[in-house]
Curated annotation (Swiss-Prot):
Main location: cytoplasm
Bias (Gly residues): 46-100
Biased composition (Low complexity): 27-45
Keywords annotated in UniProt: Acetylation, Cytoplasm, Phosphoprotein
Residue positions, PTM Phosphotyrosine: 120, 213
Superkingdom of source: Eukaryota
Compartments reported by the entry: Cytoplasm
Name of the coding gene: Cdv3
Name of the molecule in the record: Protein CDV3 homolog
Phosphothreonine: modified positions: 4, 205
InterPro entries, sorted: CDV3
Residue ranges of the region described as Disordered: 1-236
Amino acid sequence: MAETEERSLDNFFAKRDKKKKKERSSRAANAASGAGGSSAAAGSRPGDGGSLGSGARSGDGGSSGSGARSGDGGSLGSGARSGDGGTSRSGDGGSAGPGGKAITKDENEWKEFEQKEVDYSGLRVQAMQISEKEDDDNEKREDPGDNWEEGGGGSGAEKSSGPWNKTALVQAPPAPVTVTETPEPAMPSGVYRPPGARLTTTRKTPQGPPEIYSDTQFPSLQSTAKHVESRNRYLK
């Protein structure tokens, strides 16, 4: 009984191992074929793609199967990594390998862009000449008096005609005002006189002694009383 149980267990594990190995080999073959097709279509790493594709095709018969069963997966691994297609269709891998490497090198290399030098000196001079002409035209438009003198009086008047270019009438300068200064009379030396006394001439009258009995020169209270009485009489 024990032997039969051991055999049944061995058979069971052997079947399970076979199924696992078959699944692994089929997965590896599918992965190799898919990788070979994608590399051949994209053009990247064609050496690896050729080795993988050749390995997948040749592995369908016996190499891949035997390698998977016996555990010797070195041929597939080495063929896929090193791109050595000697065992299966090495011509395909050899023909596509160097061309693909050259293409990848050209793509990876930097191409220096050389900018063409253009001479803009003529354009700059032309632009400066145009700007100078425009400045001259603007100056001629702003100064109609110069055009009048240069054109003889006809062109300037035509250009400056219009209500927006009316020139103000030139006013005659006012006549200068002449200020006449009155000469001052000569002053006698040594004596100061005020301005009012300088113009009036006074005659000197002989002065006699004062009149003591005159009321005008020597007024008194009695004379004022007499004056009041005489006034009252006239009023009555």
